[in-house]
Amino acid sequence: MTQNIQKNIDQVVEWLREQVRNAGAKGLTVGISGGIDSAVVACLIKKAFPENSLGVILPIKSSTKDVEHGILTAEACGIEYIEIDLGEEHNTVANKVVHQLNNKNLFNTGMERAMDSNLRARLRMSTLYAVANNLNYLVVGTDNAAEIYTGYFTKYGDGGVDILPIASLKKYEVYEWAKVLGVPKEVLEKEPSAGLWEGQTDEGEMGTSYKYIDEFLEGKAIPEKDLTVIERLHRNSAHKRTMPPSPKIG
């Protein structure tokens, strides 16, 4: 199995080089969150462009562990990295939005967490593109097949990228690749989380498990409760996977 995974890794590495050539770019950059998906992508882009790849760690009131795991990942992959703390910028934008909406008695407290977490993802996206534009690099996404199918990403946030090298990998395959690529044990063993708030986990937020999503994507039978959740997530996130609608005029 390891041999097959290595063959697939080599194929994706060559694909990454081809994408950069076709775009007339010079290299690749990725946001390193301290999680498994970004760790795999960081290792892949380092293999594709040893001298022209950059990891960017973008904490926004993030846990110390996430930052530590991001650094561990970069060091394990051997990829050059920078850290840009966006906590102050996030506070500035969030506070201004809340203040102005409150002035008009429009602020919806029930949507504050969604607003806050999506703002974090979009600030990171904007910053990644600022870095990429300066270096003439492409921004590489980290979403896997389970996340894309369920829409577990922020529109124009972590979903705002140039290329998606692991979009066809189910979550368990991401772990298999991570082991072959030498991703640190600390990252392999941590519970998947977007780090959006204290105690937040991917599976807790989605309402189902990656195991069941992977099995669903492979056409296997899963519990009815989880099937209902997955189908609802897919249906409600259709707008994230398509161009914005526009009317036909005339």
Swiss-Prot record:
Binding site for deamido-NAD(+): 122, 155, 162, 239-240
Pathway(s) the chain acts in: Cofactor biosynthesis; NAD(+) biosynthesis; NAD(+) from deamido-NAD(+) (ammonia route): step 1/1
Binding residues for ATP: 31-38, 142, 171, 193
Keyword annotations: ATP-binding, Ligase, Magnesium, Metal-binding, NAD, Nucleotide-binding
GO cellular component terms listed in the entry, alphabetical order: cytoplasm
Coiled coil: none
Catalysed transformations (reactions): deamido-NAD(+) + NH4(+) + ATP = AMP + diphosphate + NAD(+) + H(+)
Residues that, per the record, bind Mg(2+): 37, 147
Keyword Transmembrane helix: no
Superkingdom assignment: Bacteria
GO molecular function: ATP binding; glutaminase activity; metal ion binding; NAD+ synthase (glutamine-hydrolyzing) activity; NAD+ synthase activity
Xref: SUPFAM superfamilies: Adenine nucleotide alpha hydrolases-like
NAD as UniProt keyword: yes
Enzyme Commission number(s) from the entry: 6.3.1.5
NCBIfam families: nadE (TIGR00552)
Subunit record text: Homodimer.
Known function: Catalyzes the ATP-dependent amidation of deamido-NAD to form NAD. Uses ammonia as a nitrogen source.
Protein name per Swiss-Prot or TrEMBL: NH(3)-dependent NAD(+) synthetase
Lineage of the organism: Bacteria, Bacillati, Bacillota, Clostridia, Peptostreptococcales
Gene symbol of the encoding locus: nadE
